[in-house]
């Protein structure tokens, strides 16, 4: 909304927010607008989170970790046939746009941290003509960085599913055992 009831002092409220929908290209466009504002404000890194994510580390650890780009990536192995076919179709669609071979492409979780230096590499990419209209948020950022020669290694940024090949959040009980598993695994956030 362009007129929230309450917001922190010195917060920026977009007067004309981009309407977004789950899995839509609009999420990439809205994220880019947020990142551009952060860039203009001199931020050294940007962190994209969701309201259903909980921190697993102290603020100091989160702040230090998020100074560099952090993405949870889908592994290349262990995918089921449906996942392989879906990625193959999407990679075929976006590979020419990025100028990359299909084998170089990756899928990410939509929530991530990005350094301003890495974002600078992507500022000339115009997501409005990105050929993937559905689930663009899981393919645009990571592959944009790869297309700019940036190696993106998988990080344990957000825990969202017992199955490491799935990038969407699963329903689970947030109990002590799960929290301990996430913390020991080095995750920064858990998404429920």
Model-assigned labels for residue ranges:
Residues 1-192:
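ER/Golgi luminal nucleotide-sugar-dependent glycosyltransferases, focusing on the catalytic module
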């Amino acid at each position: 909304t362009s007129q929230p009831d309450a917001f922190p002092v010195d917060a920026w409220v977009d007067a004309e927010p981009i309407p977004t929908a789950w899995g839509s290209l609009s999420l990439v466009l809205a994220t880019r607008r947020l990142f551009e504002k952060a860039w203009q404000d001199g931020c050294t890194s940007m962190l994209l989170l969701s309201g259903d994510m909980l921190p697993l580390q102290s603020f100091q650890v989160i702040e230090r970790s998020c100074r560099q780009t952090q993405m949870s990536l889908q592994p290349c192995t262990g995918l089921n046939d449906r996942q392989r076919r879906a990625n193959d179709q999407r990679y075929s669609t976006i590979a020419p746009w990025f100028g990359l071979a299909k084998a170089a492409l990756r899928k990410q979780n939509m929530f991530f941290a990005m350094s301003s230096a890495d974002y600078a590499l992507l500022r000339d990419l115009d997501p409005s003509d990105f050929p993937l209209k559905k689930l663009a948020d899981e393919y645009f950022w990571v592959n944009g960085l790869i297309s700019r020669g940036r190696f993106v290694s998988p990080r344990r940024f957000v825990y969202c599913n017992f199955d490491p090949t799935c990038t969407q959040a699963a329903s689970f009980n947030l109990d002590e055992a799960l929290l301990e598993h996430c913390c020991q695994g080095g995750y920064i956030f858990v998404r429920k």
